[in-house]
């Protein structure tokens, strides 16, 4: 059996703890469309090899949700899942608006300034809470951290493979 292709899946949350004695899980949702995930029938946890059937998913507090997976019915089984990441198949994702994108799709894009200066390639997204930060790497140079805010990131062209940002002077302190 072939291992699942990571690119076919989207990270939607992280299991933070067991809840109760019947196998419910606390999950920190990182999806901007948790209401869409509530309508889905399956979720992949951990190594992506096995789908779990969603019995119930509802908001608990803020971005914390309670998740019931039909295959997880004891506290011990739920505790064994603590710290694992939860994914949905890309084909199950909510449709994106024109100005929306999956963070995962930014990794690998070329980053340039509005003047056309090559800054490097996006290698990682750091989720900070206030705003995401794009890590840009160019061979032989220190990584550049680019805040993912409209005043800095001018455009994202997934199809064209580029992210355009303001000038380097606006991003990198001297």
Swiss-Prot record:
Keywords: Chaperone, Cytoplasm, Ribosome biogenesis, rRNA processing. One of its GO terms (biological process) is ribosomal small subunit biogenesis. InterPro entries: PRC_barrel-like_sf, PRC_RimM, RimM, RimM_N, RimM_N_sf, Transl_B-barrel_sf. It comes from the Bacteria. Its main location: cytoplasm. The keyword Kinase does not apply. It is found in: Cytoplasm. One of its GO terms (molecular function) is ribosome binding. GO terms for cellular component: cytoplasm; ribosome. The keyword Chaperone applies. Pfam families: PRC_RimM (PF24986), RimM (PF01782). Residues 98-171 form the PRC barrel domain. Binds ribosomal protein uS19. An accessory protein needed during the final step in the assembly of 30S ribosomal subunit, possibly for assembly of the head region. Essential for efficient processing of 16S rRNA. May be needed both before and after RbfA during the maturation of 16S rRNA. It has affinity for free ribosomal 30S subunits but not for 70S ribosomes. The PRC barrel domain binds ribosomal protein uS19. Belongs to the RimM family. This is Ribosome maturation factor RimM. It comes from Herpetosiphon aurantiacus (strain ATCC 23779 / DSM 785 / 114-95).
């Amino acid at each position: 059996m072939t291992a699942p292709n990571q690119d076919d899946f989207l990270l939607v949350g992280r299991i933070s703890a067991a809840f109760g004695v019947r196998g419910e899980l606390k999950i920190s949702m990182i999806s901007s469309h948790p209401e869409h995930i509530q309508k889905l029938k399956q979720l992949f946890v951990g190594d992506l090899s096995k789908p779990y059937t969603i019995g119930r998913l509802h908001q608990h507090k803020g971005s914390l949700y309670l998740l019931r997976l039909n295959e997880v019915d004891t506290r011990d089984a739920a505790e064994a899942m603590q710290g694992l990441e939860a994914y949905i198949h890309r084909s199950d994702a909510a449709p994106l608006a024109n100005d929306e994108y999956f963070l995962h799709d930014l990794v690998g894009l070329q980053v340039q300034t509005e003047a056309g200066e090559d800054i490097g390639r996006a290698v990682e997204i750091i989720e900070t809470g206030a705003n995401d930060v794009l890590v840009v790497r160019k061979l032989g140079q220190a990584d550049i951290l680019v805040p993912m805010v409209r005043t800095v990131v001018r455009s994202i062209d997934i199809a064209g493979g580029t992210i355009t940002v303001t000038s380097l002077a606006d991003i990198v302190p001297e």
